[in-house]
Amino acid sequence: MFYGVDLTSRLMLGTAQYPSPQVLLEAIEASGAQVITVSLRREGAAGGAFRALLAKSRCRLLPNTAGCHTVREAVTTARMAREVFGTSWIKLEVIGHADTQQPDPFALVEAARVLCAEGFDVFPYTTEDLIVGEKLLEAGCKVLMPWGAPIGSGQGLRNLAGLRSMRAHFRDVPLVVDAGIGAPSQAAQAMELGFDAVLLNTAVAKAVDPVGMARAFGRAIQAGQEGFVAGLMPERDMASASTPVFGLAELA
């Protein structure tokens, strides 16, 4: 449940860097995603054609503030996105480091506070830091989106312990792993940890077969979520035979 919206798909898909508009639409359909992210900058460059294209997908739009480095830039972009796309949903990105694309936690919390006060439903791109998460919730956010690894790196879940801790600490808060996912197995792993959804883009857009990869991610995320619900067996330090030793043949 994200801001009162119940989604059947746990995959959120980005819309940048695809080989063609047709491939993008086919990938969205193959993935089963119900939420797609969109950049206001791309919408402006396309002159409205991109928005018309996305309307064909019938997905819910999640505009983002990609490329923003200050509170002012992020807030202004969010306000414009609400007018252009007609939604209060906003994926809030305030980048603090150009090389790693790591979010600036101080600017992020301040921008979230401003936008939540203005009625936005904020999806903040953050790290797995628990204190930052607490501050974002205090600012009014009802969803947290910690990164798995730097955007576009494909490194997967670099800090498993931190993500586990975040899931345990924020038991009743929807959590979405956002950024750094490069393979379906990594997305499944995030869901097995108990996360509520995964947001990704580059892993599908830059695949040899984006449509096939989108389908693979959709299935992997569903499998990971079902595995978590079913209950994963606990890890052991030592072996534990699954076959009983009683009834073994006695050899002379």
Swiss-Prot record:
List of catalytic residues: 91 (schiff-base intermediate with dxp)
Protein's cellular compartments: Cytoplasm
Protein name: Thiazole synthase
Keywords for this protein: Cytoplasm, Schiff base, Thiamine biosynthesis, Transferase
Annotated catalysed reactions: [ThiS sulfur-carrier protein]-C-terminal-Gly-aminoethanethioate + 2-iminoacetate + 1-deoxy-D-xylulose 5-phosphate = [ThiS sulfur-carrier protein]-C-terminal Gly-Gly + 2-[(2R,5Z)-2-carboxy-4-methylthiazol-5(2H)-ylidene]ethyl phosphate + 2 H2O + H(+)
Function description: Catalyzes the rearrangement of 1-deoxy-D-xylulose 5-phosphate (DXP) to produce the thiazole phosphate moiety of thiamine. Sulfur is provided by the thiocarboxylate moiety of the carrier protein ThiS. In vitro, sulfur can be provided by H(2)S.
A GO molecular-function descriptor: thiazole synthase activity
GO CC annotation terms, alphabetical: cytoplasm
Family, similarity comment: Belongs to the ThiG family.
Cross-referenced PANTHER family: THIAZOLE SYNTHASE
Organism: Gluconobacter oxydans (strain 621H)
Residues annotated as signal peptide: none
Listed SUPFAM superfamilies: ThiG-like
Pathway it works in: Cofactor biosynthesis; thiamine diphosphate biosynthesis
Residues annotated as binding 1-deoxy-D-xylulose 5-phosphate: 152, 179-180, 201-202
EC number: 2.8.1.10
Pfam families: ThiG
Main EC class the enzyme belongs to: transferase
Oligomeric and partner information: Homotetramer. Forms heterodimers with either ThiH or ThiS.
Gene Ontology annotations of biological process type: thiamine diphosphate biosynthetic process
